[in-house]
Amino acid sequence: MEGIDLSKYLKNIPEYITGRNRYNPVDMLKTVLFAFADNGYCSLRKLEDNCKVNMRYMYLMNWKTPSYRTFGYFINEVLAESIEAIFQDINLAIFAQEKVDLSHLYIDGTKLEANANRYSWVWKKATEKSRYRLFAKITALLDEINEELSWSGLRMETNEEYVPEHLAEMLAAYARFYQLDEADFVHGKGRRKTIRQRHYERLQAYMHRLEEYRKKLTICGDERNSYARTDHSATFMRLKRDYMGNDQLLPAYNIQIGVADEYIAVADVNHYRSDMDCFVPLMEKFRGLYGFYPEYPVADAGYGSYNNYLYCEAHGMKKYMKFTMFDKESKDRKYRENPYRSENFRIDPDGVMRCPNGKAFHFCYRKNVQGNRYGRQEEVFECEDCSGCPYASECKKTPKNRTVRINRELTAMHREVLDNLNSIHGALLRMNRSIQAEGTFGVMKHDRRYRRIVRRGIDSVRLEVFLVSIGHNLYKLCNKTMKKQYAA
């Protein structure tokens, strides 16, 4: 830490001083980072107590004892914007000292439960269904109002969909036409509302409910299907840690790390449920930190997709991420040599694909793969005639002629990945990934007891994860240094 200029990260501290003298921010930063290196995750109360009773913390704080509120303000207000830069500079200092190889990056992800109520879900599809039901109710109400206004020539326009601003204009026009004043409305038992008051209040209630649905859909966004009411950034996901034992969804964040020589080189926090969507943001963050892409990004089958393989090709990275059926392709000889798999169909001299019965497959059409950002297409082929085929029970599952979907580019990529990972170098990388990347999460969760997110909001969670990552790297550096001293 002595070789790093820490003052450049402490710019958010106000220049004016009121009350007692300010604690030294450099001492506070060192104390906070040491606390996360010492404990894995350190609460503010524990940090305050350690500054009173633990000699190491007392020395770092120069015998001062800030309160937990002071530490909380310092972390949330001063470190929030600069935590990634601190992470970068500390990593560069450690990597230069330890000669860390950043060309090999071992990637893994885990889902940590968020600090949110487990039953405070908001589902995007349910909200959309409720909104469309509300559209029908609004149309029915406007038809009633138009029937009431038929004598006047005034008409409320009906549509298939509505927005709150449009309803607000119609509500104001209705109140203006009848000179309605909410102060004159009656409520309570024994008071009878007029038909105009009923229409006004129903339209107003629909407007507020429509605004609520729009707010929920805006919070949810286009990239996820749920969120928690008590932490809008948390998404409901399936976790390995299931309290009720019924495979329920829990609010969580997807934490991604890239490990190099047992140090966390890059970390990221996402609300994606799948690891496939997290690969590109993690690589872009790595490039932002170090100015280049890793030559060998090694990951499990959760990351191997057409999009990610194309991304690796475009940025000069080798394909060392497994795909979904990698283990079955590598270990299951019966599956690999199954004659009824389309990959094993022979191609005759005319370039026509033929099944084990010798029937030709003819090209039908090309189909875009839904949700693929690179415009991936599949070619659909259909067998000329499957009637009376002796292999029909093993080859197909429907009474129709068999159809197969083929993406030759993706198939070629899978062959390249198989060759890479089944080589001696690939086997060593796979072994190292399971040791380093998964081992890092094992140390964080089991040894250092960091199993659940404490803060709320994506920015605060990202701050927390970077503090934990810095602490892990300092912890690893300390262990390696002590082992070298003992060996000497």
Regions found by a protein language model. Name each.
Residues 1-30, 36, 408:
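Basic, short loop/linker segments at the boundary and entry of helix-turn-helix/winged-helix-like folds
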Residues 21, 32, 40-53, 64-488:
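Anion-binding and metal-coordination hotspots
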